[in-house]
Amino acid sequence: EDGYLLNRDTGCKVSCGTCRYCND
């Protein structure tokens, strides 16, 4: 949602615009 996809590998959200992964 809002240009964000849920990464099932990390369970975090990845921004398609900047390809950023959350490290929480």
Curated annotation (Swiss-Prot):
PROSITE patterns reported for this sequence: LCN_CSAB
GO molecular function, one term: toxin activity
Subcellular location: Secreted
Organs and tissues of expression: Expressed by the venom gland.
InterPro entries: LCN-type_CS_alpha_beta_dom
Function (record text): Binds to sodium channels (Nav) and inhibits the inactivation of the activated channels, thereby blocking neuronal transmission. This toxin is active against mammals.
Name of the molecule in the record: Neurotoxin-2
